[in-house]
């Protein structure tokens, strides 16, 4: 849709084609929703100097013809403001602010619950140079070693099912969080599911769960953008 030069710095694993950050997937889906494409640049946890120009230390970082925007939520607002003729990320709602609660819920509630399940798999996806940093930061946060986490995985999956209850209840009544068409609210949550899909073959929802059908719909959006994305582990049943 636009001839502007967009560059997106995304978290990558040892295989640089595997881009697994949930926050980067929020942005990747938002770009596709707007009909935009960006050159993806692989970035790793220890490559902080490569995004020093953004004056912060995490991804996603979007560069639009010399303008730098970091943080997936700020990027969404930037895209909504600077590409007003493209489809709105707010869907049928009155504005992007309507997605704010879902974005916060995904980051503050869903992500921590899912992290306890996925961190051992994430560790193996990482480039070796990132593993020491990842181990130290995550073990300090969780209060146990990465190797201890699988012992409690079934408990974590049970808790994750409980955490997903509001999402499940909503999707029983409508195909997308925004109603009959997807919005940035859907992408905020879907980013978490892409994180799981890219790094692990663990089934976090059952086939008869309304969330499963919703995830399938999101995977098929934009000519299968997310479904075609390279993954580290993928079972036949997830294809």
Task: Please describe what each predicted stretch is.
Residues 1-132:
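GST-like domain detector, emphasizing the conserved glutathione-binding G-site
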Residues 26, 30-33, 78, 159-170, ...:
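Amphipathic alpha-helical segments that form well-ordered structural scaffolds
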Residues 58-63, 90-105, 141-154, 227-239:
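A short, terminal or domain-edge coil/loop segment
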Residues 60, 66-70, 132-142, 175, ...:
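Short, highly charged low-complexity linear segments
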Residues 106-213:
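GST-like fold's C-terminal all-alpha helical module
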Residues 196-239:
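Long, positively charged, glycine-interspersed low-complexity recognition regions
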């Amino acid at each position: 849709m636009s001839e502007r030069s967009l560059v997106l710095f995304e978290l990558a694993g040892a295989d640089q084609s595997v881009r697994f950050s949930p926050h980067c997937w929020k942005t990747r889906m938002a770009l596709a929703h707007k009909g935009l494409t960006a050159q993806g640049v692989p970035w790793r946890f220890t490559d902080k100097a490569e995004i020093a120009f953004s004056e912060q230390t995490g991804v996603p970082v979007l560069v639009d013809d010399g303008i730098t925007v970091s943080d997936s939520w700020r990027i969404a607002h930037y895209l909504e403001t600077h590409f007003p003729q493209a489809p709105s990320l707010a869907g049928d709602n009155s504005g992007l602010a309507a997605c704010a609660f879902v974005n916060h819920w995904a980051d503050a509630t869903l992500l921590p619950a899912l992290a306890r399940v996925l961190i051992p798999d994430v560790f193996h996806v990482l480039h070796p140079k990132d593993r020491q940093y990842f181990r130290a930061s995550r073990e300090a946060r969780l209060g146990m070693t990465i190797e201890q986490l699988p012992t409690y995985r079934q408990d974590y999956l049970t808790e994750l099912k409980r955490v997903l209850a509001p999402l499940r209840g909503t999707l029983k009544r409508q195909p997308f969080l925004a109603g009959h068409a997807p919005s940035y609210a859907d992408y905020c949550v879907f980013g978490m599911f892409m994180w799981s899909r890219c790094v692990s073959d663990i089934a976090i929802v059952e086939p008869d769960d309304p969330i499963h059908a919703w995830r399938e719909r999101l995977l098929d959006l934009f000519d299968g953008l997310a479904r075609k994305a390279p993954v580290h582990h993928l079972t036949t049943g997830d294809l």
